[in-house]
């Protein structure tokens, strides 16, 4: 298989051409473990210099594998951003094959059949033939069940499924990851302890409340529009409760006695309580 399929061919846009480790090469063993073929017919030119063989190939469902790979790649990219760490090897050949390995190791894929034509050249003579398979990109693609074509298809994963991967990954993050991904980490790192507590409480509420439901999709050429209902905390309820509690406090004798600094601190305390007591 290695003679006819280049490691780089599966991912021509990868950032490097590093040779793969022995462990990663097991990807091909896993991919071809149920590979099978049937020769349907062979035709030889009259001069016996060229021949064409028609075959039926049985491979795993490369379209399903490619779809899983694209979705998993997007998820990894999102989580990498959420980690707050830069990964210079994110687009490397090694990383991509590691992901393929994980998918093939953990998932079960059904079989798929496709017919193909293989060209052969006779490097010998008619009396002492020496037939050699002609290498081509189409042969590489057919041997892997069309995986190369599927991986290069920008429309392989529909818009609604792409958005689902994004939102589901966001939903499954912990609070710190979510804050990093949404760019709120700087707000949480303020030196003002009261503001930090309020920002943290808001993130906790968002983390616990966030949900989504995709309702419809429309595609026009290269553009797609996906309608989705997003559920988050009720900011109006928080502000209404806060204003009510604050007005009650400001109208009390305690507010006069406390002075400006204590009133300032009390306002933060009331806002924090309103956030923590927020109900959907």
Question: How should these model regions be labeled?
Answer:
Residues 1-34, 38, 143-213, 237:
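Core segments of small alpha/beta cavity-forming domains
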């Amino acid at each position: 298989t290695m003679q006819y399929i280049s490691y780089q061919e599966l991912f021509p846009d990868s950032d490097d051409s590093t040779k793969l480790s022995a462990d990663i090469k097991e990807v091909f063993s896993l991919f071809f473990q149920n590979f099978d073929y049937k020769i349907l017919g062979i035709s030889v030119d009259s001069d016996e210099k060229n021949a064409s063989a028609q075959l039926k190939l049985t491979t795993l469902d490369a379209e399903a594998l490619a779809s899983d790979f694209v979705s998993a790649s997007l998820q990894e990219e999102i989580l990498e951003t959420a980690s707050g760490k830069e990964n210079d090897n994110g687009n490397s050949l090694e990383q991509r094959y590691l992901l393929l390995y994980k998918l093939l190791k953990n998932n079960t894929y059904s079989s798929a059949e496709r017919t193909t034509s293989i060209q052969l050249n006779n490097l010998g003579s008619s009396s002492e033939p020496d037939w050699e398979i002609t290498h081509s990109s189409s042969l590489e693609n057919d041997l892997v069940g069309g995986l190369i074509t599927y991986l290069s298809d920008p429309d392989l994963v529909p818009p609604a499924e792409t958005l689902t991967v994004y939102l589901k990954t966001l939903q499954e993050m912990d609070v710190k990851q979510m804050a990093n991904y949404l760019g709120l980490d700087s707000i949480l790192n303020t030196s003002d302890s009261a503001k930090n507590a309020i920002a943290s409480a808001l993130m906790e509420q968002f983390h616990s409340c966030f949900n989504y439901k995709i309702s419809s999709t429309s595609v026009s050429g290269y553009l797609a529009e996906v309608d989705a209902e997003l559920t988050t905390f009720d900011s109006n309820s928080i502000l209404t409760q806060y204003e009510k509690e604050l007005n009650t406090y400001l109208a009390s004798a305690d507010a006069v006695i406390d002075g400006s600094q204590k009133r300032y601190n009390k306002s933060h305390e009331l806002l924090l309580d309103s956030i923590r007591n927020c109900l959907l």
